[in-house]
Structure formats: C-alpha cells, structure tokens
Amino acid sequence: MIPKEPEMLLSYVNMKLRDRYASFEEMCEDMDLDPEEIRTILAGAGYRYDGTANRYQAEIETVR
C-alpha cells in the first residue's frame, strides 16, 4: 500500500524513483500501481513528473 496523503506520496515515489527505478512507468508496472491515481493525487497538490530528472517536482507557473 502506498501513502495517499500528497506530501507523503511525493516523498515515497521520489525515493523509489531515485533508489530503484529508471522511470515512473517502470516503477508503476513493477509495483503494480495505478499511475493515473498517483498522477491525480500529485497533480492536485501541484506536482508533476519530470522525466528528464526522473522525479516529481512542484509545477512552476510562468509570470507574465
């Protein structure tokens, strides 16, 4: 079971990505996780996956 609270989930997912997996998709497949559920929870808290950095991070809003 993975954490459902956004900040705990963020920490958990980023730790797994850093320590074990080359991509978010690989992690979800290997751990039998629903990627859409994770994306929805983290997006709702303002986080997005950066494939280049292989981690979730805060979305940056552009100032006009």
What does each of the following model-derived ranges do?
Residues D32-E61:
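Short, charge-rich amphipathic interface segments used for partner binding and complex assembly
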Residues M1-E25:
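N-terminal acidic leader/helix
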Residues C28:
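The alpha-helix within a helix-turn-helix
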